[in-house]
Amino acid sequence: NKLGLRTLAVHVDNGWNSEESVQNIKNICEPLGIDYASHVLDWEEFKDIQLSVLKSSIVEVEIPTDIAVLGALHRVAAKHKIKFILSGGNYATEGILPQKWFYDPKDLKLLKNIQKRFGTKKMKTFPSFNFLEEIYYKFIKKIRIVYILNYFPFDKEKAMAVLKEELNWKYYGGKHYESKFTSFVQSYYQFKKFNLDYRRATFS
């Protein structure tokens, strides 16, 4: 609001929200007068896709959510003729994982092949996002992703303190733990199955 932006907050609900994350959305949007849209994924379809990815034993088990978020955000932006998607991605706290720890989170071809092999349902309502769709939204619809936190010194601890003090924001316990699934993946699953401890990258 201080920047004078006319913001539409978009929540992609994949069924794994922590209670704190849901309340945080309300605590931020309502007092600031931010318009809010929720894109709810089909739970039966989405959990079947997630189960397929787990069965495939690839490391990057968050591919379904990563693709769905990009797909939903661009669809909402196109629907409302919005030209800029503001991302919280930043150089200060993101992009820290070793290359061997992750894979392209936008590989829709991989996801479709995994679902075809291990899944029981078709991807009928899943908001896809692939290379051709990225070109369409970027060059035809002129939609750009802006990493706004890279344009000024970003201090995560100070940002969290401001959110807590001014908007009654509550911490959910860890990096990306706003999702119950992500907290399970990063704190247990990837550590036990692949010996990957995200804390090593985060703390270093």
Where are these regions (language model features)?
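Nucleotide-activated chemistry modules centered on ATP-dependent adenylation/adenylyltransferase
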Residues: L3-S204
